[in-house]
Amino acid sequence: MKDMRTAEQTIDEVLNLAAGHFKVPREKLSPDDDFFKTLKIDSLQALDLLTRLEQHFHVELPDYELQGVSDFRTLASRIQARL
């Protein structure tokens, strides 16, 4: 069955999960933020976040779809496309 989340709900969930995972206030994150810069994370930490997001949304994101993705909005749209 197709997931009925809206794009905005997916973005909100991505931001909430990232904030909780990295213990930063949710209000410090916005959809167009570069998560590497905003969260001050490296590629291994980003991979950990991606794994958690895949588990939460029950999706698998191929590496080629994530190349060059660094903002929450684009990441959420890639997730949304797989729901």
Q: How does the language model describe each region?
A:
Residues 2-41, 50, 55-56, 60-83:
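Phosphopantetheine-dependent thiolation modules in NRPS/PKS and related acyl-activating systems
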Residues 45:
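Two-component histidine kinase catalytic core, primarily the HATPase_c
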